[in-house]
């Protein structure tokens, strides 16, 4: 028995590995991952190849009800304004006309100021603060435009005379002389224009008289010829 144990100890025990144990349990995982990745790549390519559909913006339909209400409100406002004007007295209508005229004048003044490159008219003419020569020209042009709106008034000439006197009081004698010369030049030009106008009117009247005189001359010649014939007949008798 002891010999058997010695023999068993001396002999090498060879353990054969199990074939199943040699199989890598992770084997095939890489293949599955490769297949999965290739499948995902194909799906991504298909998604990229698909044409993207752009959604058309939803068309906003006009609110017909709102438009109808606004139109109705506008018509009512016009009717109320017409009734208000119809119930006005003559004095109230005149005041309303002057008010609208003032609004129009302010609008025209604003356009004139914008023409000169001025946008601020909060204070009207008082907003001007001219410093340079160009600014004084703009101020003078605007002021002249404003005053000229009342040129049809019978009080306008006297107003201008008083205004010029009031303004010239602050001038020196040298500057006042310049103003006087400018006014005299303007007066001379006005006289020439009036003479030309009167001359043209006179020429037009003379042309009309010449035509009338020619017709009368024909009648006079006929009458003279008739008188001569009568005289010759009397002499013959």
Swiss-Prot record:
Chain intervals with Basic and acidic residues compositional bias: 47-58
InterPro entries noted in UniProt: eIF3-like_dom_sf, eIF3j
Keyword terms: Coiled coil, Cytoplasm, Initiation factor, Protein biosynthesis
Coiled coil: 63-115
Record GO biological process: formation of cytoplasmic translation initiation complex; regulation of translational initiation
Subcellular compartments: Cytoplasm
Region called Disordered, residue ranges: 20-64
Origin: domain of life: Eukaryota
Compositional bias (Acidic residues): 28-46
GO cellular component, one term: eukaryotic 48S preinitiation complex
Record field: transmembrane: none
GO molecular function: translation initiation factor activity
PANTHER family per UniProt: EUKARYOTIC TRANSLATION INITIATION FACTOR 3 SUBUNIT J
Record function comment: Component of the eukaryotic translation initiation factor 3 (eIF-3) complex, which is involved in protein synthesis of a specialized repertoire of mRNAs and, together with other initiation factors, stimulates binding of mRNA and methionyl-tRNAi to the 40S ribosome. The eIF-3 complex specifically targets and initiates translation of a subset of mRNAs involved in cell proliferation.
UniProt similarity note: Belongs to the eIF-3 subunit J family.
Subunit description: Component of the eukaryotic translation initiation factor 3 (eIF-3) complex. The eIF-3 complex interacts with pix.
Protein name: Eukaryotic translation initiation factor 3 subunit J
Organism: Drosophila grimshawi
